[in-house]
Amino acid sequence: MSDANTPAPSSAAITSGVTSEQSLVDWLQTMPEVDPSSPSRLPGWSVGHVMTHIARNADGVLSMFSGLHQYPHGLDGRNADIEAGASRGWSELVDDVVSRSRAVAAAIAGRADWTGTVHMLPGERPTAQVPLLRQREVEVHRVDLGFGDEFADMPADYVRRDLRLMEMLWTSRKPMGMTTLPDAALALDPPTRLAWLMGRVEVPGLDPAGLF
């Protein structure tokens, strides 16, 4: 995918992503201990799975910034790393997420060159999209952990930016001429519309978005 039409992330977008990382760190460090084997909101994944994924995704961003593939050992290696880490104790999981979140926040905040592309698991993506995609991982998986956060609690500026990207993705997968979301989707408030596009909520009268 070319990055010709992907502008560099704004300073406000960078700050928003870094703030999401710090908010995640603060949230986890003040939370009472949780049983990592407890089910998350993601089918088949425990809290330990989601926590490990958040940390390994941060490692993936750092890997891409070094010119390597997001997950050098591919999908199977990514899944194996998540399985291997999911059974760790709560404090070890928190320490892992905290250290990786701080590292990726510093890397994003300190990066000056947003040109070119990176090697993500699905394929090439513009480097300039990485801050938003990482912020998505942080914000959406906070909800997936099942500790009480909802899409309505997400930063409004993040929701606005990711809605734009997700709506473009939805449109790109429809036949020519179907260029807008269904009226029932457009009637939803932005956080709920984003949750529907990401397959996190069912909406009466709407088929699943089918993007993930």
Model-predicted regions and their roles:
Residues 1-42, 49-52:
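Basic, Lys/Arg-rich alpha-helical nucleic-acid-recognition elements, primarily the DNA-binding modules
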Residues 2-13, 63-70, 113-212:
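Structured surface interface patches that mediate subunit assembly and partner/cofactor docking
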Residues 2-4, 77-85:
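A short small-residue
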Residues 18, 22, 48, 55, ...:
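A structural signal for well-ordered alpha-helical segments within the folded catalytic domains
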Residues 21-29, 58-62, 98-112, 139-142, ...:
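Structural signal for well-ordered, non-membrane alpha-helices
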Residues 25-46, 67-71, 110-123:
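Helix-loop segments that flank and shape redox-cofactor active sites
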Residues 47-76:
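Conserved alpha-helical segments that form or flank metal/cofactor-binding pockets of metalloenzymes
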Residues 81-100:
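A short, structured beta-strand-centered segment in the mid-to-C-terminal lobe
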